[in-house]
Amino acid sequence: MRIRYGWELALAALLVIEIVAFGAINPRMLDLNMLLFSTSDFICIGIVALPLTMVIVSGGIDISFGSTIGLCAIALGLLFQSGVPMPLAILLTLLLGALCGLINAGLIIYTKVNPLVITLGTLYLFAGSALLLSGMAGATGYEGIGGFPMAFTDFANLDVLGLPVPLIIFLICLLVFWLWLHKTHAGRNVFLIGQSPRVALYSAIPVNRTLCALYAMTGLASAVAAVLLVSYFGSARSDLGASFLMPAITAVVLGGANIYGGSGSIIGTAIAVLLVGYLQQGLQMAGVPNQVSSALSGALLIVVVVGRSVSLHRQQIKEWLARRANNPLP
């Protein structure tokens, strides 16, 4: 617990240092309004990264969420184009996202195949389905479906009490997932499943039901992100979530989640989302090409994984030495 809070404080300090450093290069980075409203460019990554944290804590992984976003976006456009009222179209899109998550969970549970392999397969399945629906809508390739009502396209660009709507939705998701993972019995079950699935099963923990809930929440969050992105850009495209995979997983791991399961932090992930998002924006404002920005995000992920692995092994060695000191061999 102490280590987790220490890591979160370190991330928060690093976030402040990052903003100040980029502010020295470009003073616009120090403008509060710019910092708040620029989150709309990347905060949907955070909306997906929060439930993804819980999936990884449980010992699983889901790399299909980017394709789920694209599929849900195209489905929303196709529903609207077919004359379905916008509120109903949004509801059906959210249900589709949850269904995609349940498909992942069902395949993982009943085939016992590694979640990485399953979600790699569904990544291509959902991406192909999105392109198929795009063709049905007459939007060839990565062309978008437009013509949405102004009330919908304005939604993601509104602000309430000085906060952009996407950021408000992210904060609501943050509160809900933090309470669920860290303050409920069901959340404790997620940690136990990640630490030892076999022990959790023998302890009468509903492992399969919990996994279904986690993957469904990730799919639902992907659908929420899709709706916000379509509203923000005013266009439904099958590639809307294509660039989400690397920054989302980087944020989860940087936030303190063990990639093998058993530990993680919703607050840590939230701070890491801002850290990664502002890193990319700061580099762009400094004139750094997007390719270099992506490479730095990948390098950051590698450094964090290696650093946490070294830290974990050092802690294990210290504990082993302490046990040896307290119980010397005869």
Model regions and ranges:
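Transmembrane helix-bundle core of multi-pass membrane transporters
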Residues: 115-183, 210-213, 232-241, 292, ...
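Inter-helical junctions in multi-pass inner-membrane proteins, predominant
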Residues: 25-37, 131-137, 156, 181-187, ...
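Cytosolic-side transmembrane-helix boundaries in multi-pass membrane proteins
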Residues: 1-20, 195, 202-209, 283-330
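Single transmembrane alpha-helix segments in multi-pass membrane proteins
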Residues: 18-82, 107-113, 252, 256-266, ...
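Transmembrane alpha-helical segments in multi-pass inner-membrane proteins
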Residues: 215, 222, 232-298
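Helix-loop-helix "hairpin" substructures at the membrane interface of multi-pass membrane proteins
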Residues: 85-93, 99-104, 108, 159-236
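Membrane-interfacial amphipathic/re-entrant helices at transmembrane-helix boundaries
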Residues: 1-49, 83-88, 159, 205, ...
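Short loop segments and helix-boundary regions at transmembrane helix junctions
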Residues: 1-3, 58-61, 99-144, 180-185, ...
